[in-house]
Amino acid sequence: MPTKTIYFSKARTALKYGLQALELNDQDIILVPDFVCDSIFQPIQQNSLNFSTYELEDDLSPKWSSLDLLITKKIKAIVMIHYFGQPQDVDKFIGFCKKHSIFLIEDNAHGHSGLINGRELGTFGDIGISSPRKFQGSGGVLYLNKDYKESILPALPNEEPRASSSGLKFLLNKIPKFKHLIKRAIKKRPKYEDPRAFREPSMDDFYLSKESAEEMVRINWADIRNLRRNKFDALQNIALNGGLKPIFSKVHNESNPWCFAAYAKSQEEAIQWFDWGWQNNVEVFSWPPLREEQINSNDKAFLRWQRIVCFSTDS
């Protein structure tokens, strides 16, 4: 289990200070999967580090056959992402890192409280991050599994607690048809087909507020995991009946899936699903916002992005 757990307002802040715990040198290189939200590169750049990307299979596992070829003396760490809350082959990543004497950075931003054999995702790497913000609106967790200098932990203010909207959300969820009518009356469908529409700007660093941390402890995460896995199964049936190809053949039995994700045959078909979701009160969206150079070069990750359709497992 981690030697230290620290609560920040966002996962990217947790990653920023987690990287400092690794005590890497300027311009050291981190291996990052090519299919990832562009916000992960903010803390890498803030720490004066470089990155190289590695390719993925259709199930978003690494192309292991080519990964060894990327190792150089400047490679000091690799990022392992549990996409959409589904666990990677953790043992294989750990073995790869031991073979090449590099650090394992575990990114569980999509699956907070998910487990493997009873152990929480995010706690296997030399450092790990998780994002309860995906589930409760705020919070980024840093897990440290190595000795670190206390100086890496800065004097930061706590995030101001947000006004709770859970009561209103509960009432609206009791009358979903009314909720859907309100949403469609005051909003237009987000432009999920726009690869630049959902980028997140750099933000100030905060620790998580005391109120949010206490709320996180009170939440019954086991119930949330069960509800989301059941929703995953229901969404998978919808997707299969609609001709989509699931990224994962089944949901992991201890996971906390942020969403169900599948491949459409084309971006045109993906857009049809975005429209269908908006019309039928089902949250269907795209992910991730990629780096600008990936969009401009029409690279493999961008072509993958054009076809991926995500269905929220939030109740």
Summary of predicted features, one role per range:
Residues 13-14, 36-38, 59, 83-86, ...:
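Short, solvent-exposed loop/turn segments at secondary-structure junctions
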Residues 2, 6, 36, 79, ...:
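PLP-dependent aminotransferase class I/II
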